[in-house]
């Protein structure tokens, strides 16, 4: 992009040298009229909603919370290896095929529900919303068992690269910190992975480091990092791979207003008449002897949950992406990031101590209820299904396009088996026959070629390489797409492959008398 800059004079001058311009995918990607449909199986996940259940350092029940992100990594087949019917569709010597996302529907199964999260030892003292008396001196431990319903959020992010998140973390101080001093904090970016916690009303922060009392947030967050999508950064990405489009809906209000117990690290200035008037010390009351806590906080609530405000279980048609990438899935991959806690239903399972869950007659005649005779368990379940519609497109292998793709992502050219000619050998090399013999030197370890750029991250990988179909009329989202585009009007849809823009005029039949 070309930016005009100011000079010491009173005029603005253009840049001295031309600046490279990022091309939109519509400028070098040619569409065809070939469409494919694909979908997943019913995707299910079950676990404990608050923490991992471990047995001898082995996770027996994973943490599965409605307040976690689900990041689906869809692996698509290579269209350049398709045995297409129409040989005139593209020229493999001068063109390459790519997928373009045109339709998407993320289905959520199960009923709507409002879950509860909390902490059996939450740091809160008194009710600061409508107190009836002034609290006195704090005891050593003021923690209480408090629960609340989390903030209600729905997020859908679609792109060919993982979504970027942000949170507040500890920063390195300029000088050594004193004991008990407040540390500096900084905004940190990270890749949103499957299972990361989202914001439920307490902000996006690294709670394991910021809350050393382990009593400031619910159990789901106290040992986790809460991440919020960095929409400002992703929407300003020059290539637009992280987000083709996104949907977001938030809803919350303050249910309870509390204060934190403990010593005030930054007490209110005591200058009389500025922030408050000093109470009379002769008056024996709690106001003069023990000033209340000034670290206030709220517990959120998601309020009413209805099906009228759902982002999911409805189709989305991509006509124009928000960035320069208009739905092209580079690398034959698609990332779908989902956050939805409107289906926050936690099952309570009770099992009698001296029986199993499979026992038919687990209650004996004459038994009287006793709390200690039953063990209580919690489980959270989630149900997903993803349907996609892709359009087959082709890219001309011109010099300008290859140069642009090489700057944007060199892996694209490597996957297309396009590379520069290697230089000629400069000299003779040594080759041992018995390289593993004790009489020769140790063999040189060949580094393993790592072709996965996201190997260090955790995603819910979905293999769709063998789930593509060109008969869109046989599937729900496919029929919606055909009717939406006017390709199906009560007639049988065509399933042959033709290039976009190519048409053949049939010869008129001559009428014979």
Swiss-Prot record:
Q: Domain of life, per the record?
A: Viruses
Q: Does this UniProt record's set of keywords contain Disulfide bond?
A: yes
Task: Write out the GO biological process terms.
Answer: endocytosis involved in viral entry into host cell; virion attachment to host cell
Q: Which GO terms describe its molecular function?
A: structural molecule activity
Keyword set, alphabetical order: Capsid protein, Disulfide bond, Host nucleus, Host-virus interaction, Late protein, T=7 icosahedral capsid protein, Viral attachment to host cell, Viral penetration into host cytoplasm, Virion, Virus endocytosis by host, Virus entry into host cell
Per UniProt, subcellular location reads as: Virion; Host nucleus
- A GO CC term? host cell nucleus
Which family is it part of?
Belongs to the papillomaviridae L1 protein family.
Any idea what job this protein has? Forms an icosahedral capsid with a T=7 symmetry and a 50 nm diameter. The capsid is composed of 72 pentamers linked to each other by disulfide bonds and associated with L2 proteins. Binds to heparan sulfate proteoglycans on cell surface of basal layer keratinocytes to provide initial virion attachment. This binding mediates a conformational change in the virus capsid that facilitates efficient infection. The virion enters the host cell via endocytosis. During virus trafficking, L1 protein dissociates from the viral DNA and the genomic DNA is released to the host nucleus.
HAMAP family, per this entry?
PPV_L1
- Give the protein's recorded name: Major capsid protein L1
Question: Taxonomically, what lineage is the organism?
Answer: Viruses, Monodnaviria, Shotokuvirae, Cossaviricota, Papovaviricetes
The gene designation is: L1
């Amino acid at each position: 992009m070309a930016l005009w800059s100011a000079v010491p004079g009173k005029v603005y001058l253009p840049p001295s040298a031309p600046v490279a311009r990022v091309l939109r995918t519509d400028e070098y990607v040619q569409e065809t009229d070939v469409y494919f449909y694909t979908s997943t199986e019913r995707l299910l996940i079950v676990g404990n909603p608050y923490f991992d259940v471990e047995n001898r350092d082995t996770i027996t029940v994973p943490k599965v919370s409605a307040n976690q992100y689900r990041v689906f990594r869809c692996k698509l087949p290579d269209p350049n290896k398709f045995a297409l019917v129409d040989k005139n569709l593209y020229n493999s010597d001068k063109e390459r095929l790519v997928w373009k996302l045109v339709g998407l529907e993320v289905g959520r199964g199960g009923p709507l529900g409002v879950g509860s999260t909390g902490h059996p030892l939450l740091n809160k003292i008194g009710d600061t919303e409508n107190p009836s008396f002034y609290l006195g001196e704090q005891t050593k431990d003021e923690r209480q068992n408090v629960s609340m319903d989390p903030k209600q959020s729905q997020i859908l992010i679609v792109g060919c690269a993982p979504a970027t998140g942000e949170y507040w973390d500890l920063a390195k101080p300029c000088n050594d910190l004193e004991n008990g001093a407040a540390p500096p904090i900084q905004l940190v970016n990270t890749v949103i992975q499957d299972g990361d916690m989202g914001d439920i009303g307490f902000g996006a922060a690294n709670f394991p480091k910021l809350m050393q009392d382990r009593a400031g947030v619910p159990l789901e967050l106290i040992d986790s990092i809460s991440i919020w999508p960095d929409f400002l950064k992703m929407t300003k990405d020059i290539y637009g791979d992280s987000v083709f489009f996104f949907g977001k809906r938030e809803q919350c209000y303050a249910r309870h207003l509390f204060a934190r117990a403990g010593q005030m690290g930054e007490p209110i200035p005591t200058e009389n008449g500025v922030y408050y008037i000093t109470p009379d010390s002769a008056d024996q009351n709690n106001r003069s002897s023990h000033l209340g806590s000034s670290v206030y906080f709220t517990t959120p609530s998601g309020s009413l949950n209805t099906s009228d405000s759902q982002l999911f279980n409805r189709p989305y048609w991509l006509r124009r992406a928000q960035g320069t990438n208009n739905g092209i899935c580079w690398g034959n991959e698609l990332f779908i990031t989902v956050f939805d806690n409107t289906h926050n239903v936690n099952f309570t399972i009770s099992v009698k101590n001296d029986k199993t869950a499979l026992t038919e007659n687990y209650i004996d005649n004459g038994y009287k209820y006793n709390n200690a005779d039953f063990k209580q368990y919690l489980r959270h379940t989630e149900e997903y299904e993803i349907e996609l519609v892709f359009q087959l497109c082709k890219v001309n292998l011109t010099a300008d396009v290859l140069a642009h793709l090489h700057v944007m992502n060199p892996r694209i050219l490597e996957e297309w088996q396009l590379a520069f000619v290697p230089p000629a050998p400069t000299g003779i090399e040594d080759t041992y026959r018995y390289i593993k013999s004790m009489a020769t030197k140790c063999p040189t370890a060949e580094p393993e070629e790592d072709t996965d750029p996201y190997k260090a991250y955790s995603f819910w990988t979905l293999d769709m390489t063998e789930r593509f179909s060109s008969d869109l009329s046989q599937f729900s989202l496919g029929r919606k797409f055909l009717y939406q585009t006017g390709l199906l009007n009560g007639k049988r849809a065509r399933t042959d492959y033709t290039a976009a823009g190519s048409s053949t005029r049939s010869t008129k039949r001559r009428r014979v008398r």
